[in-house]
């Protein structure tokens, strides 16, 4: 019976999704122009991308998540060079900086590739070492969570919660986060918020996020921008936009509009047509590739929101290609709902379309379809707050 009814159920969900996810308010033409212009600039500048924290992985990630047309040969070239690099390094990308693994996992996931088999090596499993990852401070666990959750990858039981708890323990008095000191930094606070978004159903996470967003709002300048270490820069505005994106908040959330100016407007003030983004607005500033890459990621998030697609780091639309659905009547509905971030696979590369649908999964899909915010209650004795479905019931 389930086999006969699954396509109809998924079709009904897809129709509901069309109603529940209206297109976001039209992004200003300048944002679309900046997206296409910056994508073109980086594509030409980084002609042969490879594994690199600058002018490599982030460029490929931004292009892949933008949804703009890019020739497949560009991505295939990156994958070939990445595989060769990883093989040359014998799978050891760095002894201490485990963000190297997270970054590569994010790019591979965006390209629909399996990070557990690249050049004969597994670049996902190093993120399973809590001690090694957490030695890097806040950025290690934050990006490990982004990488693990980007494709819904299986991980050792309790590992994700360890990372979440580690991040929460670093919260500053009054809210927010910083790599050092007692003053919240907008970039770091925004990055941590991005990584915690999937865990917003946990009360402690939700409360920390509320304080962090309040701190970011207080840090916002009158022109809509943000300053990191006393310098107003494009990267700070970009990261705050990505935090709003991750939590599904409006980019013009009233808390982030100062004197009529938004973070998106502030970001665009750093854009130079035909050249990408500058780091600061000083007249003598030259184009900085890191500014271009982070600007591209934020603009891609804006673009995806406008098209009603999932957030930048929710990559089930890219990674979920299920071979067993070939010829299955539910294939198209599954792929479209996956692209919307409503459903995902089993975490092992399969979808199992004829498996029973449990109540936890159904409630999760319904909440996502209706655009509701997950919220934990203790109504059910057999549901743990830390469970992936706890906030959806």
PLM features: residue spans?
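Bacterial N-terminal signal peptides that target proteins for export
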Residues: 1-10
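Terminal, non-catalytic domain-edge segments
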Residues: 26-37, 266, 280-320
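An alpha-helical repeat/solenoid feature that recognizes helix-turn-helix modules
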Residues: 47-71, 92-116, 133-160, 172-210, ...
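Bacterial N-terminal signal peptides
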Residues: 10-18
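Sec/Tat signal peptide C-region and signal peptidase I cleavage site
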Residues: 21-25
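Low-complexity, Ser/Thr/Pro/Gly-enriched N-terminal "stalk/linker" regions
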Residues: 26-93, 103-107, 111-126, 147, ...
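Feature responds to low-complexity, polar/acidic, surface-exposed segments characteristic
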Residues: 129-131, 173, 177, 203-206, ...
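Glycine-rich, acidic and aromatic/proline-enriched surface loops and short helix-turn segments
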Residues: 169, 197-198, 218, 245-246, ...
């Amino acid at each position: 019976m389930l086999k006969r009814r699954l396509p109809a159920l998924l079709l009904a969900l897809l129709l509901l999704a069309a109603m529940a996810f209206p297109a976001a308010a039209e992004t200003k033409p300048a944002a679309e122009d900046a997206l296409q212009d910056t994508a073109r600039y980086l594509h030409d500048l980084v002609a042969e991308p490879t594994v690199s924290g600058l002018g490599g992985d982030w460029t490929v990630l931004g292009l892949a998540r933008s949804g703009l047309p890019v020739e497949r040969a560009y991505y295939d070239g990156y994958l070939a060079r990445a595989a060769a690099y990883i093989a040359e390094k014998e799978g050891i990308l760095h002894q201490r900086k485990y963000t190297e693994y997270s970054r590569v996992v994010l790019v591979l996931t965006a390209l629909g590739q399996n990070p557990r088999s690249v050049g004969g090596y597994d670049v996902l499993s190093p993120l399973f070492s809590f001690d090694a990852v957490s030695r890097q401070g806040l950025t290690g666990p934050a990006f490990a969570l982004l990488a693990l959750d980007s494709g819904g990858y299986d991980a050792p039981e309790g590992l994700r919660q360890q990372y979440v708890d580690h991040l929460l323990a670093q919260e500053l008095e009054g809210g927010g986060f910083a790599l050092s000191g007692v003053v919240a930094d907008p970039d770091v606070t925004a990055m941590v918020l991005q990584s915690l978004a999937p865990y917003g159903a946990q009360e402690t996470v939700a409360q920390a996020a509320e304080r962090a967003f309040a701190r970011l709002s207080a840090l916002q300048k009158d022109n809509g921008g943000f300053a990191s270490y006393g310098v107003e820069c494009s990267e700070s505005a970009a990261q705050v936009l990505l935090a709003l994106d991750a939590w599904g908040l409006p980019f013009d959330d009233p808390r982030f509009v100062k004197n009529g100016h938004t973070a998106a407007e502030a970001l665009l003030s750093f854009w130079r047509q035909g050249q990408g983004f500058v780091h600061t607005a000083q007249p003598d500033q030259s184009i900085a590739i890191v500014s271009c890459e982070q600007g591209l990621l934020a603009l891609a998030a804006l673009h995806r929101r406008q098209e009603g697609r999932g957030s930048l780091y929710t990559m089930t639309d890219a990674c979920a290609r299920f071979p067993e659905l070939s010829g299955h009547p539910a294939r198209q509905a599954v792929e479209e709902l996956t692209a919307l971030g409503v459903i995902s696979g089993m975490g092992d590369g399969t979808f199992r379309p004829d498996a029973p649908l449990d109540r936890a999964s159904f409630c999760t899909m319904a909440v996502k379809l209706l655009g509701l915010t997950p919220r934990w209650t203790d109504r059910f004795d057999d549901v743990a707050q830390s469970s992936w479905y706890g906030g959806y019931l």
